[in-house]
From Swiss-Prot:
InterPro entries noted in UniProt: ATP_synth_b/b'su_bac/chlpt (IPR002146)
Protein name: ATP synthase subunit b, chloroplastic
Organism: Phaeodactylum tricornutum (strain CCAP 1055/1)
UniProt membrane topology term: Single-pass membrane protein
Extra remark: In plastids the F-type ATPase is also known as CF(1)CF(0).
Location of the protein in the cell: Plastid, Chloroplast thylakoid membrane
Subunit structure as annotated in this protein's UniProt entry: F-type ATPases have 2 components, F(1) - the catalytic core - and F(0) - the membrane proton channel. F(1) has five subunits: alpha(3), beta(3), gamma(1), delta(1), epsilon(1). F(0) has four main subunits: a(1), b(1), b'(1) and c(10-14). The alpha and beta chains form an alternating ring which encloses part of the gamma chain. F(1) is attached to F(0) by a central stalk formed by the gamma and epsilon chains, while a peripheral stalk is formed by the delta, b and b' chains.
Length: 179
C-alpha cells in the first residue's frame, strides 16, 4: 500500500500523467520492429503449431463422431435385442399360461377321477354294510320267530299231559327205529 501512495504522491508533484508523442523516446519503433521480426520469423513456427492444433481438433471431432456413430449402432442393436427379449418373454408368458391351464384341467380331471373312485368305494362300503345289516336283521327275525314258536308250542302243549306223552312216545319210537 505504501508503494501506491508513493506513486500517487510522485505523480501529483510532477504535473500528473501525460501522453508522450515522441516516437523515438517512447521506444514504439523498437516494439513494432520486434513484433514484425517475431511475426516474420515465427510465422512458420506459429503456422505449424496452429496447423497441428487444427488437425488435433479435427481428429478429436472425427473420433467423437465415430464414437457417437458406434454408440448409436450399439443403442440400435441393444433396442433390437430388447425387442427380441420382449418377444421371447411374451412367448414364455403365453406358454406358461397355456401350461397352467393344461395343468389346472388335468388337476380337475384327476380330482374328478379321484372323487369318482372315492364315491365308488363309499358306495361299495355302503352296499356291504347294507347287506350285513340285512343279514343281521334276517337272523334276528328268524331267531325271534323260532323263540316265539317255541314259546307258543310250549304254551300250547305244556298244560296237556297228553302232548308230553305223545312227544315222549314219538321220541322213543324214533329212538327205536334209529337203533
Amino acid at each position: 500500500m505504501e508503494n501506491f501512495d508513493q506513486i500517487f504522491t510522485l505523480l501529483a508533484e510532477h504535473e500528473g500523467i501525460g501522453l508522450n508523442l515522441n516516437i523515438l523516446e517512447t521506444g514504439l519503433l523498437n516494439i513494432l520492429t520486434l513484433v514484425g521480426i517475431l511475426i516474420y520469423a515465427g510465422k512458420d513456427f506459429l503456422g505449424s503449431l496452429l496447423e497441428e492444433r487444427k488437425t488435433t481438433i479435427v481428429k478429436g471431432v472425427q473420433d467423437a463422431e465415430d464414437r457417437l456413430n458406434e454408440a448409436q449402432k450399439r443403442l440400435n442393436e441393444a433396442q433390437k435385442q430388447l425387442n427380441q427379449a420382449n418377444l421371447v418373454i411374451s412367448e414364455i408368458r403365453n406358454e406358461t399360461i397355456a401350461t397352467k391351464k393344461v395343468l389346472l384341467e388335468s388337476e380337475v380331471f384327476g380330482a374328478k377321477k379321484d372323487l369318482k373312485i372315492r364315491f365308488e368305494r363309499a358306495l361299495a362300503m355302503f352296499k356291504s354294510k347294507e347287506r350285513q345289516i340285512f343279514l343281521e336283521i334276517k337272523q334276528q327275525i328268524i331267531s325271534l320267530v323260532l323263540k316265539r314258536t317255541v314259546i307258543r308250542a310250549q304254551q300250547a302243549f305244556a298244560p296237556k299231559e297228553r302232548a308230553t306223552t305223545l312227544i315222549n312216545d314219538t321220541i322213543n319210537k324214533l329212538e327205536g327205529d334209529l337203533l
